[in-house]
């Protein structure tokens, strides 16, 4: 992960490709600045998060869809398959249509869970750095 000192010129255009890529548990999404400074939702070229999230029920998914409709003018919809995934595997449905998803963890979620529960500072950054020593990029 980068140190967070990139310039807006380093940002990457947003790309939303649901239902192929959405914020189910284990997916990678690009970090970004907030809508007030980044209304085009451009992605960081150096920072990302790994989605852990939660398991949803229909009421929570309906609430998420309302919020997503507000910021996408109704252009981004949770499909029945996405809803089922959120109700069984979990994730972060509230991020759909707002953050670019670009990959997934295929093994090692137990390590992600350790990172998730690490002690953090006032900016929600882990006190101790975590390093990814090995990653494999595959094409679907």
Label every PLM stretch briefly.
Residues 1-140:
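Cyclophilin-like peptidyl-prolyl cis-trans isomerases
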């Amino acid at each position: 992960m980068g140190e967070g000192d990139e310039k807006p010129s380093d940002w990457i255009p947003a790309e939303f490709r649901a239902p192929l890529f959405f914020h189910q548990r284990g997916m990678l999404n690009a970090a970004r600045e907030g809508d007030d400074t980044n209304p085009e939702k451009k992605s960081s070229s150096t920072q990302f998060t790994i989605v852990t999230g939660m398991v949803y029920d229909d009421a929570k998914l309906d609430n998420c869809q309302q919020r997503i409709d507000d910021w996408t003018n109704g252009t981004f919809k949770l499909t029945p398959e996405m809803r089922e995934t959120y109700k069984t595997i979990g994730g972060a449905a509230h991020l759909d249509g707002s953050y670019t998803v670009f990959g997934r963890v295929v093994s090692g979620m137990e390590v992600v869970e350790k990172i998730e529960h690490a002690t953090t500072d006032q900016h929600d950054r882990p006190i101790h750095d975590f390093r990814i020593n090995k990653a494999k990029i595959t094409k679907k």
